[in-house]
């Protein structure tokens, strides 16, 4: 079972971004493979720390994790800890920490005199999400797409599989997503395929290297000469797609489900974004939800409350017989076990609570009125609170003594 991301970084759930980054830097330096050669345990911890930081440093992923646990972020965090993933993309935080300690400066600029001046170059090419190798092959990442999925309480109780059509950006079939009419692209003449431009500045403290995204190709490393007339060189166009969504039992209104790679297609061969499905719970005409339990209001006649009875009540999957014990008082909650919402993490379901209320007719006929008058004469059925011979209170007795 995966450990809690907050526990891995050793921070509270209320920690802000600075606290999370500080904890990450400390642990990343501690378990970095260069400091722990041939140490498998340290290597695994380093991956674990990167995975936790990738989620908690991203506002959207952190919100999904807080609401839905590891299921809310799916496998995105784990995939991010490999080469080219977001986890190693934040490895610059480690280099920033090295610069803080040894050169006294912050930021991304590097000096030729720093003992770690070449350290970042090694990793940015092999691991960083901003490395030139990634730009040459990955294109532009597609954007995430968010939709709302309305579900009934019955669907939420058992879990459901939905197949729906959505509108999204899809890969252009005419150019196969390249954006080029001929299907070919050329190496960018400005950055020569690296996706970035570098400018060296010499100062009295050494040489600074400033790196920025290539303005010609936007960081892709390649340019389109003969634009596709169907997608205007973007490699994507508006379209439709059919997606299958598996919703587990026990989700709540506002929960997120993330379908990896089901979002908008990326321009010119870029990886697709994710489809974020926001759960919307429809109001139910019979039941009210309380966590994984549901509540049903049942009106019962006065005679049945007094003498007891058996009544058929609805559930989310049919009807069951409920025994009303003799002498049941109004607003009593009777429990029917296992007839509520399935638990999100599995292992059973919540309960159905029947709230018993007394039924009071708005109008009665002459015969029924006579029956009620007869019942009213019984002090057991209707205690006569207006009887002058009722037992006096202690205050009334004291008043009689001193009057």
From Swiss-Prot:
Q: Where does the J domain start and stop, copy by copy?
A: 4-69
The residues forming a coiled coil are none
User: Could you tell me what the cofactor note in this record states?
Assistant: Binds 2 Zn(2+) ions per monomer.
Question: Gene3D superfamilies recorded for this chain?
Answer: DnaJ domain (1.10.287.110), Heat shock protein DnaJ, cysteine-rich domain (2.10.230.10), Urease metallochaperone UreE, N-terminal domain (2.60.260.20)
Please name the GO terms that the record assigns under molecular function: ATP binding; heat shock protein binding; unfolded protein binding; zinc ion binding
The keyword Metal-binding is annotated on this UniProt entry: yes
PROSITE patterns, A to Z: DNAJ_1, DNAJ_2, ZF_CR
Q: Which GO terms describe its biological process?
A: chaperone cofactor-dependent protein refolding; DNA replication; protein refolding; response to heat
Q: What InterPro entries does its record include?
A: DnaJ (IPR012724), DnaJ_C (IPR002939), DnaJ_domain (IPR001623), DnaJ_domain_CS (IPR018253), HSP40/DnaJ_pept-bd (IPR008971), HSP_DnaJ_Cys-rich_dom (IPR001305), HSP_DnaJ_Cys-rich_dom_sf (IPR036410), J_dom_sf (IPR036869)
Subcellular location(s): the record lists: Cytoplasm
**Record SMART domains:** DnaJ
UniProt cofactor(s): Zn(2+)
The entry's Zn(2+) 1-binding residues are 172, 175, 228, 231
Stated family: Belongs to the DnaJ family.
Main function: Participates actively in the response to hyperosmotic and heat shock by preventing the aggregation of stress-denatured proteins and by disaggregating proteins, also in an autonomous, DnaK-independent fashion. Unfolded proteins bind initially to DnaJ; upon interaction with the DnaJ-bound protein, DnaK hydrolyzes its bound ATP, resulting in the formation of a stable complex. GrpE releases ADP from DnaK; ATP binding to DnaK triggers the release of the substrate protein, thus completing the reaction cycle.
Record remark on domains? The J domain is necessary and sufficient to stimulate DnaK ATPase activity. Zinc center 1 plays an important role in the autonomous, DnaK-independent chaperone activity of DnaJ. Zinc center 2 is essential for interaction with DnaK and for DnaJ activity.
Question: Which PANTHER family does the UniProt entry name for this protein?
Answer: CHAPERONE PROTEIN DNAJ, DNAJ HOMOLOG 1, MITOCHONDRIAL-RELATED
Q: How does the record describe its quaternary structure?
A: Homodimer.
Question: Which NCBIfam families does the entry mention?
Answer: DnaJ_bact, PRK14281.1
Please give the name of this protein.
Chaperone protein DnaJ
Annotated organism of origin: Chlorobaculum tepidum (strain ATCC 49652 / DSM 12025 / NBRC 103806 / TLS)
């Amino acid at each position: 079972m995966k450990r809690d991301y907050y526990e891995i970084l050793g921070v509270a759930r209320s920690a802000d971004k600075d606290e999370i980054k500080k904890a990450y830097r400390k642990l990343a330096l501690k378990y970095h493979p260069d400091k722990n050669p041939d140490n498998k345990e340290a290597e695994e911890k380093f991956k674990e720390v990167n995975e936790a930081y990738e989620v908690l440093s991203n506002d959207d992923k952190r919100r999904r994790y807080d609401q839905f646990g590891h299921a809310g972020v799916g496998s995105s965090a784990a995939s991010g800890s490999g080469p080219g993933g977001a986890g190693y993309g934040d490895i610059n935080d480690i280099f920033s920490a090295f610069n803080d300690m040894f050169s006294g400066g912050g930021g991304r600029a590097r000096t030729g005199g720093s003992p770690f001046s070449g350290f970042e170059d090694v990793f940015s090419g092999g691991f960083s999400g901003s490395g030139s190798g990634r730009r040459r092959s990955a294109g532009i990442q597609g954007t995430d797409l968010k939709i709302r999925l309305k579900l009934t309480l019955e669907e939420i109780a058992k879990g459901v599989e939905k197949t729906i059509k959505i509108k999204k950006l899809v890969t252009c079939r005419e150019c196969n997503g390249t954006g080029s009419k001929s299907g070919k692209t050329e190496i960018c003449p400005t950055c020569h395929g690296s996706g970035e431009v570098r400018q060296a500045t010499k100062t009295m403290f050494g040489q600074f290297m400033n790196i920025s995204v290539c303005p010609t190709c936007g960081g892709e490393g390649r340019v389109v000469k003969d634009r596709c007339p169907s997608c205007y060189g973007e490699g994507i166009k508006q379209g439709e797609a059919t997606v299958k969504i598996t919703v587990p039992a026990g989700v709540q209104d506002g929960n997120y489900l993330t379908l990896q790679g089901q979002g908008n297609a990326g321009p010119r061969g870029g990886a697709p974004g994710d489809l974020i499905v926001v759960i919307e719970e429809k109001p139910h005409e019979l039941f009210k939800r309380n966590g994984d339990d549901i509540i049903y209001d049942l009106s019962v006649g006065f005679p049945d409350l007094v003498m007891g009875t058996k009544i058929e009540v609805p559930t989310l999957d049919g009807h069951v017989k409920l025994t009303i014990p003799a002498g049941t008082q109004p607003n009593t909650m009777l429990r029917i076990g296992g007839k509520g919402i399935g638990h999100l993490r599995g292992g059973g379901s919540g309960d159905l609570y029947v709230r018993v209320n007394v039924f009071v007719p708005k109008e009665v006929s002459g015969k029924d009125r006579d029956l009620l008058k007869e019942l009213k004469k019984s002090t057991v059925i209707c205690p006569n609170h207006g009887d002058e011979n009722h037992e006096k209170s202690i205050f009334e007795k004291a008043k009689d003594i001193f009057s």
